[in-house]
Amino acid sequence: MDIWKPEIKYLRYTNGFNVSELEDACFKFNYKFPKVGYCRVPSHAWCRNQGSFCATLTLYGKSKHYDKYFGVITGFTAFANTVEEAVNKLVFLAVDFITWRRQELNVHG
């Protein structure tokens, strides 16, 4: 099986489904406005057994003082058999991570 990953040139972007929940979390905790992309997974790809569609997001941090972005925090990828399921799964994972990271940063200063 071939190595496969979602490529930016093949992604379509959405703000439908539950992406507004992710946008709210990013705004609240000072992350760059999210761009959720999705694409079809090729039939020859190693991850095809996870689902026919892939949703992806790269989470960027943002400085409060200068309104500049300070780089990649992490990336998320979710697979499912429909675009809606993949995007919803991705949003759930990303919001959960953002909430967890906020709690950990508060605990450890």
UniProtKB/Swiss-Prot annotation:
InterPro entries documented for this protein: Corona_NS2
Family, similarity comment: Belongs to the coronaviruses ns12.7 protein family.
Name this polypeptide is given: Non-structural protein of 12.7 kDa
